[in-house]
Amino acid sequence: MLRFIAVFALVNCALAGTLPNDLDGRIVNGVDTTIEAHPYQVPLQNAALSHFCGGSIISEDLVVTAAHCMQSYTASQIKVRLGSTIYNEGGELVSVKAFKFHEGYNPKTMVNDVALIKLATPVRESSKIRYIRLADRTPPTGTPAVVTGWGTKCFLTCVSLPKTLQEVEVDIVDQKACASNEFKYGSQIQDTMVCAYALKKDACQGDSGGPLVANNQLVGIVSWGSGCARVGYPGVFCDVPSVRSWIEKTAKEL
């Protein structure tokens, strides 16, 4: 069911599967951008400093990501790089003190796919590091949005991983519309989800945990989908307004 597994892509991404150990970031048909344009974006890196997921910084020591990103790691195995357009160099590399994923996260249905990371060292805002506000309501269908992450500029045929941050423009598809007959997911789209869609553009293969931003607010967290940039299958995100109260509560506990 997770969208970010290369072998799924080779078999047209059947909507079933197990969680991968590493999730390498991909944006389909995106363009180069800079961290100054998206200073809330961060890459999560494992002990070998390999990129495995994205995230969004929301305060001096808190990063929001996807629950499914965190299943194979302990806090000591994760580092967060902030303030760099290049995923594996520059900026500030910060250790993780603790993290928690949503108690209601279900890897089969992908509901509540959200986690909160507490950094070991607080970071200050700058031109390259900015905290992003959590949206308190889901924008209506058709609202322009942007997804960012690190990865190939095309689907399957690109073998190299660009070091430069990528962005792709999409349109919001709210939960009701995404579950309608206009698209092909049906009842798989649940209340804690929001979708985004643009022809031949998408997040894919491990931009998991990264931001979906509209109106300068964090609207969604990259979660899952059927393949990447497939006609009739929007990208599916954890709906931030639906889990905002959990994020705020957990922020006080970490």
From Swiss-Prot:
Q: Quick check: keyword Secreted in the entry?
A: yes
Indicate where this protein resides in the cell: Secreted, Extracellular space
GO MF entry, a single one: serine-type endopeptidase activity
Tell me the function of this protein. Answer: Involved in digestion of a protein meal.
Q: Name one GO cellular component term.
A: extracellular region
Q: Which UniProt keywords apply?
A: Digestion, Disulfide bond, Hydrolase, Protease, Secreted, Serine protease, Signal, Zymogen
> Quick one: signal sequence residues?
1-16
Which enzyme class? Answer: hydrolase
Q: Which PROSITE patterns match?
A: TRYPSIN_DOM, TRYPSIN_HIS, TRYPSIN_SER
| Annotated catalysed reactions | Preferential cleavage: Arg-|-Xaa, Lys-|-Xaa
Q: Where mainly located?
A: secreted
Residues at site: Required for specificity? 202
Show the disulfide pairing.
53-69, 154-158, 178-195, 204-228
Q: Which GO terms describe its biological process?
A: digestion; proteolysis
Residues covered by the Peptidase S1 domain: 27-252
Q: Give residue ranges for the propeptide.
A: 17-26
Organism from which the protein derives: Sarcophaga bullata (Grey flesh fly)
E.C. code: 3.4.21.4
Protein's name according to its UniProt entry:
Trypsin
Q: Which family does it belong to?
A: Belongs to the peptidase S1 family.
Q: Which residues form the active site?
A: 68, 113, 208
